[in-house]
Regions:
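A short, Lys/Arg-rich alpha-helix, primarily the initiator
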Residues: 58-86
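N-terminal cysteine/histidine-rich coordination modules
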Residues: 1-67
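Alpha-helical linker/edge segments of TPR/alpha-solenoid repeat scaffolds
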Residues: 130-136
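Short alpha-helical DNA-recognition segment
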Residues: 88-106
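Short, basic-rich loop-to-helix N-cap that marks the start of a DNA-contacting helix
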Residues: 111-124
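Generic structural marker for isolated residues within well-ordered, non-membrane alpha-helices
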Residues: 81, 91, 120
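Helix-turn-helix/homeodomain-like alpha-helical modules used for DNA recognition
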Residues: 14, 139-157
């Protein structure tokens, strides 16, 4: 027996049932709009497109969105590593400044490994703000060691 379509609370039509679709997104972790694979079933209204996520759908979407999330972090990390200007800083020097193991950025650039969202954010910031952001990074730890606590408080105000 085929389940009857449910009524849509937005438009009132009786056309809500699990559907596949293109171009759907969901907020997930740090991403405001992570793409949902086209073949995922999400209860939606055929007429107005309203989506209805119940506990079962959310549980099924979790592992799917996690895979998409990891793939997107890997893609962005590789992109930002390629955009970093080598004339300003070598990958090895950057690994040392960021406290990363030797060769980690090369692995990420090749699509291996799973970078943290924080590392992807930092790589994106460095790539977008080069060369100023790279110079700030080079001097960051030196500045921290030379500052006393009152100087830090004055800078915060």
């Amino acid at each position: 027996m085929i389940a009857e379509d449910q009524r849509c609370v937005r438009c009132g039509s009786r056309s809500v049932r699990p559907r596949t679709g293109k171009g759907r997104t969901r907020p997930y972790r740090v991403f405001a709009a992570l793409p949902v694979p086209d073949d995922c079933l999400i209860p939606a209204c055929r007429r107005c497109g309203a989506q209805y996520l119940d506990d079962e759908t959310i549980a099924a979407l979790g592992p799917v969105l996690e895979r998409v999330y990891v793939a997107e972090l890997q893609r962005l990390a590789a992109l930002y590593i390629r955009r970093l200007p080598r004339r300003l800083i070598s990958q090895r020097r950057l690994e040392l400044l960021l406290g990363l193991s030797q060769g980690y950025l090369s692995r990420l650039a090749a699509g291996d490994g799973v970078p943290s969202a924080q590392l992807v954010l930092l790589l994106g910031h460095l790539a977008d703000g080069a060369p100023e952001s790279i110079e700030n990074l080079k001097n960051f730890w030196r500045r921290q060691l030379s500052q006393t606590e009152p100087e830090q408080k004055e800078k915060d105000q």
